[in-house]
Curated annotation (Swiss-Prot):
It is an enzyme of class 2 (transferase). It comes from Nitratidesulfovibrio vulgaris (strain DSM 19637 / Miyazaki F). Keywords: 4Fe-4S, Cytoplasm, Disulfide bond, Iron, Iron-sulfur, Metal-binding, Methyltransferase, rRNA processing, S-adenosyl-L-methionine, Transferase, tRNA processing. Disulfide bonds join C109-C342. GO terms for biological process: rRNA base methylation; tRNA methylation. One of its GO terms (cellular component) is cytoplasm. This is Dual-specificity RNA methyltransferase RlmN. It comes from the Bacteria. S-adenosyl-L-methionine binds at G169, E170, S201, S223, L224, H225, N299. It is found in: Cytoplasm. It catalyses: adenosine(2503) in 23S rRNA + 2 reduced [2Fe-2S]-[ferredoxin] + 2 S-adenosyl-L-methionine = 2-methyladenosine(2503) in 23S rRNA + 5'-deoxyadenosine + L-methionine + 2 oxidized [2Fe-2S]-[ferredoxin] + S-adenosyl-L-homocysteine; adenosine(37) in tRNA + 2 reduced [2Fe-2S]-[ferredoxin] + 2 S-adenosyl-L-methionine = 2-methyladenosine(37) in tRNA + 5'-deoxyadenosine + L-methionine + 2 oxidized [2Fe-2S]-[ferredoxin] + S-adenosyl-L-homocysteine. Reaction proceeds by a ping-pong mechanism involving intermediate methylation of a conserved cysteine residue. One of its GO terms (molecular function) is 4 iron, 4 sulfur cluster binding. HAMAP family: RNA_methyltr_RlmN (MF_01849).
Length: 367
């Protein structure tokens, strides 16, 4: 029995016409039920004949991640602990913002692996180690769960507006499933997210970088976090196997759309990478390409030997970058009180949570 959410549209159409003997238009109907109408069962597909629904139910299943816990931060950030079909546990986060019209909008942070192989020394997920890659169905299942939780069931996504592959895992080490996910996200009859609303963040993996760029399916963000090879090798030992010089050389030829820039994420670690000398090196580095910088203040994580810089050092770092015509924005941290902020996603407590019943706080109304 196949997991039907794991099929791209072309695969679904080929399977339904070939294996089930259905006309092509049936595949389009089923596809829209799966991705636009949040159908959890074939019985819900009311414009599909009963006979076809019965054949579908005999040959396929619709498997969503199981919600184990839902935690809501004082700032409105929502963190889901999800169990996959084999019992593996992952997290996804909804980060709120307010539109110019005063309406609540959400950015969803997606995981793409169970654990992470990169082992970055400042990241809680990195301390978990790597278990396995997630499938397309598991990656996009996070979106389905969040949309259902928020009542966001319209194709124009009035609530969940942006998606960022910045959760657990390194996307370019799960390139095949991430690319399949991006195509389904972009499909106008699927989840229907514009590429301009999707960002894929990578530590800088040579394999896959060019393919992602040429696809045009998402914006690129690079987890840089260091202005030189020595610091990067110390805090990101596995990512540093590909040197900063090689990374920047690849990014110099990365295909960008008009007015598009590469976002560099830079985590400010007190006494490690936050001096003016570091800022000076950083300017020289990122000036090699069209760039903007997201400055992220370190979020404390249990067992990790780092601290946030002082506010004075943070502002001095930012001001130096601006003085050299480098766009730099200090990203406001959200969800710290529920361990949902950058670098805090971790399934270390997941074994004890595995048997926990669903815990969900009252939903907040979104305008």
């Amino acid at each position: 029995m196949i997991d039907i959410l794991n099929l791209t549209y072309d695969e679904l159409e080929a399977w339904m016409t070939g294996t089930l003997g259905e006309p092509r238009f049936r595949a389009r109907q089923v596809w829209q039920w799966l991705w636009q109408k949040n159908a959890r069962s074939f019985d819900a597909m009311t414009n599909v004949s009963k006979a076809t629904r019965a054949r579908l139910a005999e040959a396929a299943r619709i498997t969503w991640p199981e919600v184990r816990t839902v935690k809501t931060s004082s700032d409105g950030t929502v963190k889901f602990l999800l169990a996959l079909a084999d019992g593996a546990l992952v997290e996804t986060v909804l980060i709120p913002s307010e539109s110019r019209e005063g309406k609540v909008r959400m950015t969803q942070c997606l995981s793409c692996q169970v654990g992470c192989a990169m082992g970055c020394t400042f990241c809680s997920t990195g301390s978990m180690g790597f278990e396995r890659n997630m499938t397309m169905a598991e990656i996009l299942g996070q979106v389905l769960v969040a949309r259902e939780h928020l009542g966001d069931d319209r194709p124009d996504h009035p609530i969940v507006r942006n998606l960022v592959f910045m959760g657990m895992g390194e996307p370019l080490l799960n390139l095949n499933e991430v690319m399949r996910s991006l195509r389904t996200l972009n499909d106008e009859f699927g989840l229907c997210f514009s590429p301009r609303r999707i960002t894929v963040s990578t530590c800088g993996i040579e394999k896959g970088l060019r393919e992602l760029g040429e696809s045009g399916l998402a914006f690129l963000a690079v987890s840089l976090h260091a202005p030189n090879q020595e610091v990067r090798a110390r805090i990101m030992p596995r990512a540093a196997r590909w040197t900063l010089d090689d990374l920047m050389a690849a990014l110099e030829s990365y295909p960008l759309k008009t007015r598009e820039r590469i976002t560099f994420e830079y985590l400010l670690l007190g006494g490690v990478n936050d001096s003016i000398d570091h800022a000076r090196e950083l300017v020289r580095l990122v000036s090699r390409t069209k760039a903007k910088l997201n400055l992220i203040v370190y979020n404390p994580a249990e067992g990790l030997p780092y601290e946030a810089p002082s506010q004075a050092r943070i502002l001095a770092f930012e001001q130096y970058l601006w003085s050299k015509n480098v766009t730099a924005i200090i990203r406001k941290s959200k969800g710290q009180d529920i361990k949902a902020a950058c670098g805090q996603l971790k399934a270390s407590e997941l074994a004890e949570l595995a048997g926990m019943a669903v815990t969900e706080e009252p939903k907040k109304e979104a305008e």
